[in-house]
Structure formats: C-alpha cells, structure tokens
C-alpha cells in the first residue's frame, strides 16, 4: 500500500499524538472524573495505553523502540524523583522532626513484616523459586507509590481524610521508595552469594546501608540546604524572576537524580532528603502556596508515564506455566498482597504509632499502600543486576531468557510479569476504593434521610417537630441577626482590645468576604448592641499619673506632626511643574529638615528624662524641645516607615548640599543604616516565623471518630482531642433525631475552650432553602438546587454543603423589637410587677414562673395569637432587664458538670428569679403609698399625688360597686406610675 510521501510517520510522532490526544480529552472532563467518579488520572491513562498499545490497536508500542529496559528505567527515575521531591516539599514545616517516630515505625517494622510475609507466599505458590528469589520479588513491591497515593492525599476525597493521616501517608510514600533499596540488595546478595554470610553482611552494611542510603541522605540534605540558601539570597537581592522561582524545585529534582546516579547512591532517597531540607522552614511552601506550576508538571508526566506503562504491560505472560506465572497463582498472590502486606503489621503496631489515633485509622493506613512506579523501578533494577552477572547486554522485557544463559533464568523471566500483575491489581483496588467508600456513604445518607422524613414529619405545613426547635429563617416575627463567627483569629496580647472593639471590627459594614483584608477576615462580629452596664451609665475610670502624662505627650506629638506635615506639604506643591532636578532638591530639603528634627532631639535627651521623672506640675511646662523629644522617642513617620526607622539613633551635621566631600558622621550614618537594614531583616524573619507558628496553632478542621473528636490545623497537625460521652441512649425515632447528639465534651488536652461543648442539632432538609442560599457565598456555589445542612450548637448556626464542607458560621443574636419593649416581662420581685398584681392588672397566676413559650409561636410573632402569647400593653414599659438579651459564648458554664444541666434544648429562654434586685425599704414605702395602703406626709412639691379617698372615687359602674372601686384605684395607680416613670412629660 502506497503512502503519500509527504506523510513522515515515525514511532516518536505517533507517541506524541497519542499522549496529546489523551491529555486534551481527559483535561476537558477531568473535574467530573476526579470529583464525581473518584477515578484518578493514572487509572484512565493506563486504560488508554492498553487500548492504543500492542494488545489492541498497536499504535503505540514502546517495546520496539530498542533498549526498552534502559528507556523504562530512566523515565521511571525522573518521574519518581520529581514526585518524591514534590511530596517532601509539600509536607508541613519540620514534619520529619516532629513525626519521626510514626514514619520510622512504618518504614522499618511494617516494611520488614510485609517483605517477609509476601516472600513466604511467593515461595509457596510459585514453583521453582527458592526463598531468596521470593524475597527479591517481595522486595520489589514493598514500597508504596507516591503517585497513586495522591488519590487520598489530594483532591475532593482527601478533604474527608484527617490531615494527620494525609501527611503520614505522603511522608511514608516518599520515604519508602528509597528505603526499599536495603531489602532489594539484601535479597540480591542472598541470591548472588549463597552460603557466604560474611560477604553478604559486609556488602549489605558497607555498600548498601552506609554508602547508598546514609551517604545518599547526607548528599540530599546538602543539595536541599544549598538550594534553600541560594534561592533565599536571590529572592532577597531581587535577581530571580517569578517563573524561575516556581520551577526551581524541578531543577533541584533533576540535580538529585543526576548526582545520585553518577555517584551510585540511592537517588530516590537523595530526592526526599533534598526536598525535606529545602522546605524545612516552610518559607518556599509559603511563597508558592498560591501557584500550581509544580502540579501542572507532575500531571503531564503522570499522563505520559501511565500511557507508556499501559502499553508495555506483558499480558501474554500472565498465564505462562513455563515460568510459574499461572493466572490462578497470580490472583491468589494478589489477594494476599492486598490483605496481608501492610494491614496486619499496622494493626499490631498501632499503639506504637502516635499519629494513628484509632483502629479505623490503622485499617485505613494499612489498606492504602498502593503499588506503582516504585515497583517498576525496583523490578527493572533487580532484573538488570541479575543480567549483569552473565551478560553485558540486557534482555528485553518481553523476551524470556534461555535456561542455558543463567541459572537464574526463571527469576529474570518472572519478576517482571509478577510485579506488573501486582501493579495492575493495586491500580484497580486502590484506585476504586475511594469511589466505593464514597458510594457507600452516599447510599447510607439517602437511607437515613428517607427514614427521618417518613417517621418525623407532622404538624403544620409538613414541618417536623425536631425541625421546629431551630430558629426558622423565613419568619419575620422574631428579630435576630446572623453574624460570622471567629474561626481564624488567634488571640494574642491584644485579646482584650479585640474583644472590646469587636463591634467596630465586625463584618457590619456590608462588605463581601472577598473584599476584606487579612485582618478583617475572621474578626469577631457582634450584634451591634452595646452592652449596657448596671445603672445605665458607665463609670468613668480615673486616669493615673502615668496615663495623664502619656495623653498629654500624645497631644503634643500630634500637634507637632500636623505642623511638620502641613509645612512640608505646602512646600512640596508650591510649584506644579517641577523638573527632575527640582524634585531631587525638594527631596534633599525634606531629608535635611528631618535630620535637623532628629538632631534637636539628641540635645534634649537628658532634659526629657528629668521631665519624665517629675510630677504633674513639671509636666505642665511645654517647650519645643520637649515636643521634638517626644516625637523622636516615638519614631514618627515623615514620608515612609523606612525613612523614619533609618533616622533612629543617627547624628547629623548640617552642611552645604553642594559640597563634594563627605564627613565622618555621614560615613558612620551610612554604616548605621546598613546595620539597621540588617536588623530589620532579622526582625522580619522573626515576625514571619512567629506568624507561621500562630498559623499552626489555629484550628482548621475537626474529625469525629466514634466518641473522640480530633481537632487539627490547616497543615494537618493535631492540636487537641476531645472525648464525647453519650448521655441518652434509648429514645423514640422523633426524639432521636433531635437529641441523639446530647453529649458532653471532656477536654483531654488544654487548648479547647468550654464553649465547644454545646449540643448538636442537624437539619437534613432545611425548611427555607432560599434563606439558606442567601447566607452562603454566592460565588462559591451558584446552584440553587444543591442541598445545605445546618447545625445548631447553642446560639451558633453552622451551614454545610452536601459534601460536608463548612460554608458559613453564624451567631444568632436575638434583638429587642418595639413590640417586645412594650410587652410585660415577668419580674417577680420588682415594684411594677407587685403593683400590677395588687390592683388586678396582672393575675397572680402569671406572677410566678412564666409558662414555657413555644419557640415556633414566638418566631411567628404577633400574627399568631393564642393563650400563651403575652398581652400588648403600653402603659408601663418595663425597665431595662438585668440580664443580657444577646447570648454570648462566654456565658456558658465552664465545667462539664454544669454543662450538662445548664442548657435545655426545649426552652427558648432561661428565667431566673434571682436575676432581679430585691425591693428596698424605700421602694416598698413608695409602693404601699401608691396603693393607698400607707399614708405618708406629702408636700405641694411632691411629684406623686396622694391616694384618693375611697368615698371620693367614682366610676361608670357606680361609686359603691367593686368594679368601680377597682377601676378608680387602677386609674390612680396608672397616673402615679406614669409620673414616676416619666411618661407624662
């Protein structure tokens, strides 16, 4: 068949086209495949490589490119070095120092146990192999793969995995690829030197352990340290651009692969040590946390590599009885690998691994040990070492060596297909485990939702009783406001100031969350109602001598600053058309004025100290020198903070600006400026480290594992653990939805406040979905059909999406409406309450403890009327209550015993008879005088009217009737009380 001569088809060109077509198509649907189907790119790329490979279409066949062993080994080396370096860089700051115990337990005992167990089963199931050869095959699959582990480390499913487990799996997958070398070469020495124990031990300890592993770690630490120092120096001097800065770690990964291969050390361990040292202080991760250049490079390499692997899988050798790779043997071995390689060892060693908190976490860590690229690298490396004993030319992967060439021909022939079968099994099992777990949770959620809806829906408008206990957001009768709660701020030395200024710093300005700066995001927002002290008027605090002196000095400083700034501003803008020379002259004049200003302060330093030690009489004296001294000591900003900091401690000598010679004072001032800049850089580094430590102490996520709640920061470090004790066990279906989360939180560490011990309510289907949509960010989720779940903990309202992600946190602050102010509040011991009870305006039955108010009725407001609603009266408004209307978190009980009994979920308010002051003797006399029970001497200037005689009282019902007397007495009391309370003005 003739082909048009213009078409130049080659193997490399076809490979480029296949990789490009797959990458473009998969990129278009990558979000759906990863976030909805929970399938990683490695699985899909392997399937595509199988389709276009020699098994199906035969478009892409790397086995015909020539030396396939060497090509596969070098491609695998580069991919592994990049991935391992990236894993080490993305670990939290100083992670290996803080968690070396957990990582060591997973590397040494867990890997050793898996190596021995799998080697034993390979020896049993594969005929013709001795135990040493079986250990070599087992050593190839001992390490876990950092690429396949990304399915549980990053992505949507990773948000459901605790952060400390994600970090542990990442660190382990990066380390154990390099730590597989001791197991690999120990097995190799057992095969090559049988019966020669001295040679085996000497070669394994001196060459493998000390040189390849230990020296490789030191080499990696050196490369990482030098890279960190040089990139910080380049960034400090501003001689590196942004693109090179982001791609610098890729360069270091290539450097590790190159020098590690040249020196013959464990280049995978070199890459991990270099990455951990390079990102040891967290500076590089902080600088590159918003950019994803490294992720893009890794993604492209993963696409290409797994397409390549899918094309070279030896499917024809998976059922080759000549070398012992029957398919049923391989299936049994795969089941053994999945269940016995890691799970038993991790479950047994769980008490010795600090980062594994429960048996469920131990099972999860034991299961997610995927086999991938590291196994390919180890298998080809072991095959090449065995072939080097009898030939300099490596045997291709798809060729079975003859029995005459080497006595290890079966091991050379079967090590590659057995390893590839384990990799395919791991991709299928571990790649689909995430989807299966998520599907199981989804089905479980659907079943629970149907059960709750069927058994608990009743009442008006199809609402359930457990839903009615929440403050409904679609009612207008109850006035309350929702404010974002503080989930990011760390209380430091300005804690009291932040609390007092919460109303000013809150999100009350109507700004969107994206438009706020870092200081405003996460600040505490209050209801805007200032706390009213007892008596109605806050007491003015007397200032001490020191505070008066500081206030007086502050006024003088402000005055001097205004004079200086106005003078410089007027001089600056006298001429609108200044050339470059004029601008430079103005700048020098301003610097000269600043120098003179600072010079005058140095002359009067001693006098300032005498003035500061004097009394209030000495402080009343005001001189210009004192003003300058105060301004100097407090370092005012003239034009910029840099200039003001450079003026501190400098001595200036006035001279002509046209002189060409420099004085000694100017040279000294330049040296001091350099020292000042160095000190400022050191202080900025200290501030950065302090800020990073504060970020590490901020709680980010809480995970519930049985009766234990684990609180982590954003980096996955565990901050606290809380034990949850269930109090109510047996309830009916309806009550269980509302009250199964009745629990008390017992603090096992020290960083958790008692406010976290509230009881939990969950809404599965909110009543007003439109209102909930208005509470969440519109930019995050514009789909109005999505579900939201709300949790109420005391007066906190937490809104989550259907994936369990927290969208918003709000604080419910009840407000006093006009109707509420006009209503009678139950006051048992107050004068007004007793007076109204005595005249019959208030029934004695209502004078006691008020009946429980249905919260649903209270929410609906005055539109609903019933016997439980309070009457609306405008005659005698109640004085300000002694208790605060808006509920604060600080009012919660601090001990767990009080926490369990202090809050009742069925009550909307707590009424306390002792919350009001007892009646004084003077108030009692006034009350009795107003009621006519007691006669007191009265003057003409008294504001109260004397009680009317009974015989003078008249009414519509006649003077002698009981009803008339009652109304007349009521009118007199109303008049007296109105005058007393200041209503008749």
Curated annotation (Swiss-Prot):
- Composition-biased stretches, type Basic residues, lie in 538-558
Q: How does it sit in the membrane?
A: Multi-pass membrane protein
Bias class Polar residues marks the residues at 517-526
Q: Which residues cross the membrane?
A: 13-33, 37-57, 71-91, 106-126, 129-149, 177-197, 204-224, 245-265, 295-315, 320-340, 362-382, 411-431
Q: What is its main location?
A: membrane
Give residue spans, biased composition: Acidic residues. Answer: 661-675, 887-920
> Which ranges sit in the Cytoplasmic compartment?
1-12, 58-70, 127-128, 198-203, 266-294, 341-361, 432-985
Q: What does UniProt give as GO cellular component?
A: endoplasmic reticulum; membrane raft; plasma membrane
Any single biological process term in GO: proton export across plasma membrane
Q: Where are the Phosphoserine residues found in this chain?
A: 568, 768, 774
**Pfam families (UniProt xref):** Na_H_Exchanger, Nha1_C
Please provide the record's keywords in A-Z order.
Antiport, Cell membrane, Ion transport, Membrane, Phosphoprotein, Sodium, Sodium transport, Transmembrane, Transmembrane helix, Transport
Report biased composition (Low complexity) as residue ranges: 637-646, 743-756, 970-979
Q: Which is an annotated GO molecular function term of this record?
A: sodium:proton antiporter activity
The subcellular location is: Cell membrane
Carrying Phosphothreonine, the residues are 765
This protein's source sits in the domain of life called: Eukaryota
Q: Which loops or segments lie on the Extracellular side of the membrane, by the record? A: 34-36, 92-105, 150-176, 225-244, 316-319, 383-410
Biased composition (Basic and acidic residues) is annotated at 559-572, 580-593, 676-698, 815-828, 854-863
What PANTHER family does the record tag this protein with? NA(+)/H(+) ANTIPORTER, NA(+)_H(+) ANTIPORTER
Anything further noted? Present with 1480 molecules/cell in log phase SD medium.
Family assignment from sequence similarity: Belongs to the fungal Na(+)/H(+) exchanger family.
| General function of this protein | Sodium export from cell, takes up external protons in exchange for internal sodium ions. Also capable of exporting potassium ions.
Q: What is this protein called?
A: Na(+)/H(+) antiporter
- Write the gene name: NHA1
